[in-house]
UniProtKB/Swiss-Prot annotation:
This is Heat shock 70 kDa protein. One of its GO terms (molecular function) is ATP binding. It comes from Onchocerca volvulus. SUPFAM superfamilies: Actin-like ATPase domain, Heat shock protein 70kD (HSP70), C-terminal subdomain, Heat shock protein 70kD (HSP70), peptide-binding domain. The keyword Secreted does not apply. The keyword Nucleotide-binding applies. It holds the Pfam family HSP70. Belongs to the heat shock protein 70 family. Keywords: ATP-binding, Nucleotide-binding, Stress response.
Length: 322
């Protein structure tokens, strides 16, 4: 508007832009409680004053795309939590921008007209939550916090590499922690003396596309045909996100383990988000690759079992007679 009316471009003047932005921010806040706001800046650029009015309707029109995009994280949160919006009991507003009437209307409409919970100051909601969690961690037993529980989740799936480079997840993404789970695996070759346990985090079907956290070897497995040894792998993640992975040969009781802390090769928040997006993008390709490897492994197992059958002493004579 300034450029159109006064034929001046203030884009190259950081000070003028800063003053304009501050005035617009003030007007935005005014529009949360009023239907119209004034923007008045003396000597904005080259001695020219800037005065204008903006209505709430015009503000909502200008920011329509931004307002609509605020629903994307809401939908994503429900999708990740595997919840329907009808299962949400209360909608708490967090952050100053949730005071904008249009944002509140979009939220209420999204949740089928449900009334928003405005009992907490949006600017203080995060601090309230942090204070409650601090009280719980410090052992506070008062009635105010005894019914509250903050649950953390695993940000990415955790698993190991199995035959063909496949990612086999033991702890799925968004599993509530602390948690512990075990799964039994076996050997891939005859008389295999040991197994390499490689621990990964990520959402892709193949480990080459995920993040390696650590690895260790379980050796001393007694000689046996493939598929016979029973190796129990256990993933145990505590409330602090520290992961303990162990592998034990059931026949001998021999085991080995590794501890992976949050600061040891773990991905940042941005990297986690990127990995989740890539998993969505390449989901079809990953599933096809996983199916190909599963078919290959099944064929190899069938061929191995057929070979064992043919070499069985009891059947050799019958096969020769035939």
């Amino acid at each position: 508007e300034f450029k159109r009316n006064d034929k001046k471009d203030l884009a190259s003047n950081p000070r003028a832009l800063r003053r304009l932005r501050t005035a617009c921010e003030r007007a935005k806040r005014t529009l949360s409680s009023s239907s119209q706001a004034s923007i008045e800046i003396d000597s904005l650029f080259e001695g020219i004053d800037f005065y204008t009015n903006i209505t709430r309707a015009r503000f909502e029109e200008l920011c329509a795309d931004l307002f609509r995009s605020t629903m994307d994280p809401v939908e994503k949160a429900l999708r990740v939590a595997k919840m329907d919006k009808a299962q949400v009991h209360d909608i708490v507003l967090v952050g100053g921008s949730t005071r904008i009437p249009k944002v509140q209307k979009l939220l209420s409409d999204f949740f089928s007209g449900k009334e928003l919970n405005k009992s907490i100051n949006p600017d203080e909601a995060v601090a309230y939550g942090a204070a409650v969690q601090a009280a719980i961690l410090s052992g506070d037993k008062s009635e105010a916090v005894q019914d509250l529980l903050l649950l953390d989740v695993a940000p990415l799936s955790l698993g190991i590499e199995t035959a063909g480079g496949v990612m086999t997840a033991l702890i799925k993404r968004n599993t509530t922690i602390p948690t512990k789970t075990s799964q039994t695996f076996t050997t891939y070759s005859d008389n295999q003396p040991g197994v390499l346990i490689q621990v990964y985090e990520g959402e892709r079907a193949m480990t080459k596309d995920n993040n390696l956290l650590g690895k260790f070897e379980l050796s001393g497995i007694p000689p046996a045909p493939r598929g016979v040894p029973q190796i129990e792998v256990t993933f145990d993640i505590d409330a602090n996100g520290i992961l303990n992975v162990s592998a034990q040969d059931k026949s001998t009781g021999k085991q080995n383990k590794i501890t992976i802390t949050n600061d040891k090769g773990r991905l940042s928040k941005d990297e986690i988000e990127r990995m989740v997006q890539e998993a969505e993008k390449y989901k079809a390709d990953d599933e096809a690759q996983k199916d190909r490897i599963a078919a290959k492994n099944a064929l190899e197992s069938y061929a191995f079992n057929m070979k064992q059958t043919i070499e069985d002493e009891k059947l050799k004579d019958k096969i020769s007679e035939f």
